[in-house]
Amino acid sequence: LRAEGEQKKARDWVEVDSIQEAVSFLSSVSGVIFATTGSKELEALCQIPDYQKRVYARVLPTSNVLKKCEKLGITGSHLIAMQGPFSTEMNTLFLRQTKAEWLLTKDSGRAGGFQEKVEAARENGTRVVVIRRPEEDGISLEEAMEVLKKADEGNVGELKTHLILAGIGMGQP
C-alpha cells in the first residue's frame, strides 16, 4: 500500500527514466555537472566525455566508496565525500564552489533532500536533470484512508491487500 503524493509545482527540469538516459543527455550538452545520485551511478557517469573535468560527485564518506571513486578517476576537488541531509544553503554552496551548470539528482523525495537541491539550483541558475522514480503501483491518499478505516473498524475480511506502514520519511523539523 503506497499513497502517492501530488506534485505541487510544475516541473521545470529535464526528466529522464534512468542513469543511462541522463548520461546520454549530459553527453550532448556542455558544462560542469554536480552529481548527487550516489556511488552506485558513478560508473555510468564515466561515459560522459571529459567526465574527469566535468563531473563533481557528492558521495557518502565510506572507505569503499572513496576507493571506488579513486578507481574511476573521480578524485581531488571533484570528489565531495559528506553525509547528508543537506540544506538549501549547503547545496547552493556546493553548486557555486563547483561552478556547476547542471545538477544531476534522483527524485528522492523529501527524505532524500530533493526539494533543497532543486531550490539551490534555482537560486544558483543551475539547470537540473532528474532521474524519475520508477512507476509504482500506488493508491491515492483517499483510498489509503479508506483501507485504514476498514481495518480500524475490524472489516479486515473485506480488504484485498496487506497493510504495512514503512518508510514514512524523516518528517519536518
PLM features per residue range, with description:
Residues 1-6, 108, 133-136:
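Short, ordered loop/turn segments at secondary-structure junctions
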Residues 1-26:
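Glycine/small-residue-rich loop that forms an oxyanion/phosphate-binding "nest" at active or ligand-binding sites
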Residues 12-20, 140-150:
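Short acidic-hydrophobic, aromatic-tinged amphipathic segments that line or gate anion-handling sites
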Residues 31-32, 36-79:
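Anionic-ligand binding region
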Residues 39-41, 108-110, 134, 170-171:
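Short glycine-rich anion-binding loops that position phosphate/pyrophosphate groups of nucleotides
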Residues 62-65, 127-139:
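Short, flexible loop segments at boundaries between secondary-structure elements
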Residues 70-124, 129-131:
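A C-terminal functional module that forms or caps the active site or interfaces directly
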Residues 161-173:
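N-terminal phosphate-binding or glycine-rich loops at protein starts, especially the Walker A/P-loop
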